[in-house]
């Protein structure tokens, strides 16, 4: 019993004791590794070299690397650089002391670098992909760009629907009416109006209305109809109507009346 109870207990206790210091050591080591060791130095002259930066910064501790990025296409310096220290404490001290330092006639701005040094290939992909990512972000961001256009489209569609169904479309048609069509509308109104005089009723015959629809220029204006007297209109209009009428009864009656007279 003692052997059974004793044998499992040491591994459990040992395992617990062994697990407890390990996270402490991990957290302690992670704190040292997570602290920044790289500094971003801005406002550098274009002719600044690595030796010009190494001399003033090495007084705070050993410097691991100095990087002055250049444009991938032109090869010109960008006016900033990265300095990486071996110890995070040295980097913090250098940042505090060198911020605002005059180097080659320019006041430096020193801050902690968010990322470590990148290779030229990474800088090239970043330059090329920066523009495309911006457009992708604009396409993906729904609140600014996807929600704003629909109300504008809705307004345009409403305005168009109103334009087709509302009276403004009639106004557009009334503006496009030519003076010849206006004359035709006046003649129509005369033909539809109740007959005040015989001349107006006879002048608005259906045959003439059809001629107006085909060739409005040759149509007779209502002013000329007004100049005719009722006697002239009666003498001219009944003759074609009697000739076109298909009823043969009056002709037989006329022949019968003439036979006894002869």
From Swiss-Prot:
Xref: Pfam families: RRM_1
GO BP field: mRNA splicing, via spliceosome; RNA splicing
Domain RRM: 37-115
PROSITE patterns: RRM
Keyword ATP-binding: no
Residue numbers carrying Phosphoserine: 9, 20, 166, 174, 176, 178, 191, 193, 235, 259, 261
Gene Ontology MF terms in the entry: mRNA binding
Miscellaneous information on this protein: The splicing pattern of the pre-mRNA is regulated in a tissue-specific manner and by development, and changes in response to various types of abiotic stresses.
Protein name (database record): Serine/arginine-rich SC35-like splicing factor SCL30A
Naturally occurring in which organism (per UniProt): Arabidopsis thaliana (Mouse-ear cress)
Lineage of the organism: Eukaryota, Viridiplantae, Streptophyta, Embryophyta, Tracheophyta
């Amino acid at each position: 019993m003692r052997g059974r109870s004793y044998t499992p207990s040491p591994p459990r206790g040992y395992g617990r004791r062994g697990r407890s210091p390990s996270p402490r050591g991990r957290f302690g080591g992670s704190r040292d590794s997570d602290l920044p060791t790289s500094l971003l130095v801005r406002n550098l002259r274009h002719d600044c070299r690595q030796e010009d930066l190494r001399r003033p910064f090495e007084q705070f501790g050993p410097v691991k690397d100095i990087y002055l990025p250049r444009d991938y296409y032109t090869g010109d310096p960008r006016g900033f650089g990265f300095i990486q220290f071996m110890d995070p404490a040295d980097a913090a001290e250098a940042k505090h002391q060198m911020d605002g330092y005059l180097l080659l006639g320019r006041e430096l701005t020193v801050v902690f670098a968010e990322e470590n040094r990148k290779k030229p290939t990474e800088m090239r992909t970043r330059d090329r992909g920066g523009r495309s990512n911006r457009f992708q972000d604009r396409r993906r961001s729904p609140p600014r760009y996807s929600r704003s256009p629909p109300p504008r489209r809705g307004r345009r569609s409403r305005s168009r629907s109103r334009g087709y169904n509302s009276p403004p479309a009639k106004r557009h048609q009334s503006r496009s009416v030519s003076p010849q069509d206006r004359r035709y509308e006046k003649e129509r109104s005369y033909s539809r109006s109740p007959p005040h005089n015989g001349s107006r009723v006879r002048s608005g015959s259906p045959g003439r209305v059809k001629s107006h629809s085909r060739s409005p220029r040759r149509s007779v204006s209502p002013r000329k109809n007004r100049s005719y007297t009722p006697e002239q209109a009666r003498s001219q209009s009944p003759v074609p109507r009697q000739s076109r009428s298909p009823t043969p009864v009056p002709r037989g009656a006329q022949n019968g009346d003439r036979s006894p007279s002869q």
